[in-house]
């Protein structure tokens, strides 16, 4: 199995690059975000490789990092997600943003991927929620709060305060982070109005 290729960029196709490794041209399929980050023809490049072997073909998928390749593998553990959809997701969201979106249960961010509808986005967020925190950059408390809201187990004042901030135009991750900070400073007895006020202060920092 091929795990990594280092060579010169020969040419580009719509969704692949030809990498010349000591005179042998390897066709490597990549996410559009990865292709855009690669150098021009004639320059050196290194790609982490995932090798797919089928009865009728061998296909190579390339990634800028081992982490991106790991997400490619994780995504395909989700029902309804194959290699094409996984690459599409990674074209829309870099690994760090994907991890944060899953940790925050942000289905809308995942659903922005072409070819990924609400149901598939929900499956990605739900089935990978236990694997994302290790990769995510978000505060674990914020991720926990977002999960509680998704599961309808968050305290009512907290859920209402986040909903109010979202209605004011803030994104779900922003609102959850602000209210999580507000709840920490205000304590368990804080009511919705107080949380909204403190949350807005957090957002204005």
From Swiss-Prot:
Region Flexible linker: start-end pairs: 144-153
Keyword Protein transport belongs to the record: no
Keyword set includes Nucleotidyltransferase: no
Cellular component terms (Gene Ontology): cytoplasm; Holliday junction helicase complex; Holliday junction resolvase complex
SMART domains xref list: HhH1
GO biological process: DNA recombination; DNA repair
Location of region: Domain I: 1-64
Keywords: Cytoplasm, DNA damage, DNA recombination, DNA repair, DNA-binding
Example GO molecular function: four-way junction helicase activity
InterPro entries recorded: DNA_helicase_Holl-junc_RuvA_I (IPR013849), Hlx-hairpin-Hlx_DNA-bd_motif (IPR003583), NA-bd_OB-fold (IPR012340), RuvA (IPR000085), RuvA_2-like (IPR010994), RuvA_C (IPR011114), RuvA_C_sf (IPR036267)
One Pfam assignment: HHH_5
Subcellular location field: Cytoplasm
Region (Domain III): 153-205
Assembly and binders: Homotetramer. Forms an RuvA(8)-RuvB(12)-Holliday junction (HJ) complex. HJ DNA is sandwiched between 2 RuvA tetramers; dsDNA enters through RuvA and exits via RuvB. An RuvB hexamer assembles on each DNA strand where it exits the tetramer. Each RuvB hexamer is contacted by two RuvA subunits (via domain III) on 2 adjacent RuvB subunits; this complex drives branch migration. In the full resolvosome a probable DNA-RuvA(4)-RuvB(12)-RuvC(2) complex forms which resolves the HJ.
Domain notes: Has three domains with a flexible linker between the domains II and III and assumes an 'L' shape. Domain III is highly mobile and contacts RuvB.
Function: The RuvA-RuvB-RuvC complex processes Holliday junction (HJ) DNA during genetic recombination and DNA repair, while the RuvA-RuvB complex plays an important role in the rescue of blocked DNA replication forks via replication fork reversal (RFR). RuvA specifically binds to HJ cruciform DNA, conferring on it an open structure. The RuvB hexamer acts as an ATP-dependent pump, pulling dsDNA into and through the RuvAB complex. HJ branch migration allows RuvC to scan DNA until it finds its consensus sequence, where it cleaves and resolves the cruciform DNA.
Name of the featured protein: Holliday junction branch migration complex subunit RuvA
UniProt source species: Rhodopseudomonas palustris (strain BisA53)
């Amino acid at each position: 199995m091929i795990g990594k290729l280092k060579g010169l960029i020969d040419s580009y196709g719509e969704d692949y690059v030809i990498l010349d490794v000591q005179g042998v041209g390897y066709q490597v399929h990549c996410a559009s975000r990865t292709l855009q980050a690669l150098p021009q023809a004639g320059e050196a490049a290194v790609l982490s490789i995932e090798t797919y072997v089928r009865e009728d073909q061998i296909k190579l998928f390339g990634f800028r990092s081992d982490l991106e390749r790991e997400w490619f593998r994780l995504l395909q553990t989700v029902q309804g997600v194959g290699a094409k959809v996984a690459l599409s997701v990674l074209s829309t969201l870099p690994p760090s943003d994907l991890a944060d979106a899953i940790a925050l249960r942000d289905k809308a961010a995942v659903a922005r991927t072409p070819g990924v509808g609400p149901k598939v986005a929900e499956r990605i967020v739900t089935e990978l929620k236990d694997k994302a925190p290790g990769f995510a950059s978000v505060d674990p408390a914020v991720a926990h709060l977002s999960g509680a809201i998704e599961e309808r187990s968050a305290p009512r004042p907290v859920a209402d305060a986040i909903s109010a901030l979202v209605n004011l135009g803030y994104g779900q991750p922003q609102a959850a982070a602000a209210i999580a900070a507000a709840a920490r400073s205000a304590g368990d007895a804080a009511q919705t109005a107080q949380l909204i006020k403190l949350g807005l202060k957090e957002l204005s920092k």
